[in-house]
């Protein structure tokens, strides 16, 4: 157990060394970049980017080198990282995760969740697709949108798509991640409202995956269906078409719950524009009560006998894990604090933070907290564990001590606690206002 953190660290360094054997695959000018001796060669640069937190670049370089040597200048770091392709850190993230990940199953299925989150960074008017000018005296700001695929049983990020906020399309990002996934086990993917497009459902089904998606009750896929009041679990089959002939309109009038005419602007890749065919879609619509005054409506292609409505309620509750992980990713790992305003550099930092999150989670999840006669069950304090794991990666903590240090930092699990979500505008912490 105490050697496990060292194994994870060695795996990360192994991936970086393998990439350093062929730096030309990950840089902008293969014939020039990383061909001369520098203070920040390819391998050292990647390691530094993963180790960094949210302080200034100067302080981060000093911390990562543990003050054992004079670091390269900030200008040198910026010049070296400009040579990297954005795909370099993405490859590191995915390869490291694949080498370390041991899938855990739920009833024979990998249980995944997809969600998106906005990431604010320094206003950059030179990037119009991410830039928002301030209105009513508000300062301008810039946003990227992170779409992430998350394993709910292993608590690891598996894939991510980064989009400029004005061009963000969560459904397109989900379809991209589903299409390129190499998962061999059966999969159940859960998602919140906004992912219930016909195109997305059919892409997931054709992949052989199962889906469980929360839908809007007032509009969307279920709005035209004849559904009962209260709780229910009903099978639904509808037919999609591009035709708008009188015969089709008559069918729509006679069976409004069965037929859908797709306008030309609606993307459904399995019915090209001008097609005269009908495309069948089948799924379950399930509604259940979650409190005295609120209900949830889900659509799924899971079998009713294997997954009754109570199981679906439990599955959807598990989806909250990705919401918690986003909070930890932003405010514990440091994804809300970037060291650049160029989208290419920020993309590097996002995948570096995702790699660090998985590194910390892999180590923390193997720490066993002994049960004692206490009022509450205790779990590891992830915030403290991240600090310990980051220092371990930087070489400031020896491997045998990592597990003991994490074991000593625990917090109680208090079931049944809930607080209304408070939304507020969070200002970006500029480069000149970082703690020393």
List where the protein language model places each region.
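Short Lys/Arg-enriched helix C-cap and helix-to-coil transition segments
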Residues: 87-101
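Extracytosolic and intramembrane catalytic regions of membrane-associated proteins
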Residues: 132
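Single, function-defining residue in the core of a domain
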Residues: 1-55, 60-63, 68, 72, ...
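Conserved beta-strand elements of the Class I
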Residues: 110-112
């Amino acid at each position: 157990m105490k050697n496990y953190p060292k194994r994870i660290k060695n795996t990360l360094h192994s991936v970086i060394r393998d990439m350093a054997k062929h730096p030309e695959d990950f840089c902008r000018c293969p014939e020039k970049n990383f061909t001369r001796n520098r203070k920040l060669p390819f391998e050292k640069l990647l390691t530094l980017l993963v180790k960094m937190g949210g302080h200034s670049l100067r302080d981060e370089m000093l911390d990562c080198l543990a003050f054992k040597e004079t670091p390269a200048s900030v200008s040198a770091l910026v010049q070296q990282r400009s040579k990297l392709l954005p795909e370099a850190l993405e490859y590191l993230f995915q390869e490291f995760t694949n080498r370390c990940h041991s899938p855990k199953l739920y009833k024979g299925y990998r249980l995944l969740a997809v969600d998106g989150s906005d990431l604010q960074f320094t206003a950059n008017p030179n990037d119009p697709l991410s830039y928002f000018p301030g209105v009513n005296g508000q300062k301008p700001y810039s946003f990227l949108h992170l779409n992430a695929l998350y394993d709910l049983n292993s608590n690891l990020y598996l894939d991510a798509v980064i989009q400029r906020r004005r061009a963000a399309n969560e459904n397109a990002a989900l379809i991209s991640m589903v299409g390129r996934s190499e998962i061999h086990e059966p999969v159940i993917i859960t998602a919140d409202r906004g992912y219930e497009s016909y195109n997305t459902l059919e892409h997931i089904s054709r992949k052989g995956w199962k889906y469980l998606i929360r839908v809007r009750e007032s509009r969307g896929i279920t709005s035209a269906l004849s559904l009962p009041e209260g709780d229910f679990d009903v099978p639904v089959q509808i037919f999609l078409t591009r035709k708008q002939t009188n015969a089709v309109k008559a069918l729509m009038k006679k069976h409004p719950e069965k037929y859908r005419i797709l306008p030309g602007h609606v993307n459904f890749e399995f019915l090209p524009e001008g097609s005269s065919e009908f495309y069948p879609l089948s799924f379950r619509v399930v509604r259940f009560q979650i409190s005295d005054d609120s209900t949830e409506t889900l659509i799924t292609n899971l079998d009713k006998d294997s997954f009754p409505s109570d199981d679906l309620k439990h599955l959807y509750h598990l989806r909250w894990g990705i919401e918690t992980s986003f909070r930890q990713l932003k405010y514990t790992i440091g994804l809300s604090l970037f060291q650049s305003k160029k989208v290419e550099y920020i993309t590097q930092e996002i995948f570096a933070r995702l790699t660090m999150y998985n590194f910390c989670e892999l180590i923390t999840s193997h720490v066993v907290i002994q049960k004692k006669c206490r009022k509450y069950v205790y779990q590891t304090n992830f915030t403290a564990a991240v600090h310990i794991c980051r220092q371990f990666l930087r070489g400031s903590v020896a491997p045998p001590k990592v597990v003991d240090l994490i074991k000593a930092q625990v917090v109680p699990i208090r079931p049944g606690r809930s607080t209304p979500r408070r939304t507020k505008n969070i200002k970006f912490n500029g480069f000149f206002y970082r703690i020393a």
